[in-house]
């Protein structure tokens, strides 16, 4: 009898877990739809900025006439890399399966790769998971940003990227790389590594007679465009990462719900078997008692 009570208690516990994970799955699904739409809209805008900047980059020496202009360095990779700033995004919350693993693995591998080349790498961490992971590894973090990956904010994104750009222009770092696990579709996330600074022109078709006309003056446009390019790439990465996080959490909760259902089924079978054995034992005892009285 005590065994039956224990199995019944387990069934109730697993069933409650199943209801919780199913509710979390529904919440993540609803959040994913909103995040997916935001990511799609942002991606279109970010791609258009990339295209314009890519075309301008081929004419940069015509736009910026002064060879000592510090803005030129944003387009030219240095011959000797001594320091690299790595901005990476992880989740602030858990229960999202292996969502953070890709990013943390990529960052860890890059750390080893650059250290082997005697290149100093500075980490700017966005998200509680990544911060706690590298704190546990006793690896120093240059900057820590909590609650930004779970609630992307444009002004905060600007603050993050402006600090990195300023360090590049001031000569404190030679390259800025942005790493995050991005959204591909509802069941797939993909690791994205963006070599943000210096700017790498995207592969677009170039013509001798460019259709791009620069208004206002090229230098003014470049100033505004560069600012928008860096800010929006940072902001888009946050939105893209959040959509991927909701996707991963939805899958994780769906798997947990299905596992709970399977476990309840197993426990019900065990309960019925134990109950049958209990009844059989009682019947045998009754029959034995009757026989002994004859």
Swiss-Prot record:
Compartment list: Cell inner membrane
Record GO terms (molecular function): ATP binding; proton-transporting ATP synthase activity, rotational mechanism
GO biological process, one term: proton motive force-driven plasma membrane ATP synthesis
Main location (coarse class): membrane
Membrane topology: Peripheral membrane protein
Domain of life, source organism: Bacteria
Keywords of this entry: ATP synthesis, Cell inner membrane, Cell membrane, CF(1), Hydrogen ion transport, Ion transport, Membrane, Transport
Presence of keyword Metal-binding: no
Pfam families: ATP-synt
UniProt GO cellular component terms: plasma membrane; proton-transporting ATP synthase complex
HAMAP family associated with the record: ATP_synth_gamma_bact (MF_00815)
Quaternary assembly: F-type ATPases have 2 components, CF(1) - the catalytic core - and CF(0) - the membrane proton channel. CF(1) has five subunits: alpha(3), beta(3), gamma(1), delta(1), epsilon(1). CF(0) has three main subunits: a, b and c.
The family this protein is said to belong to: Belongs to the ATPase gamma chain family.
Function: Produces ATP from ADP in the presence of a proton gradient across the membrane. The gamma chain is believed to be important in regulating ATPase activity and the flow of protons through the CF(0) complex.
The name this protein goes by in its record: ATP synthase gamma chain
Primary gene name: atpG
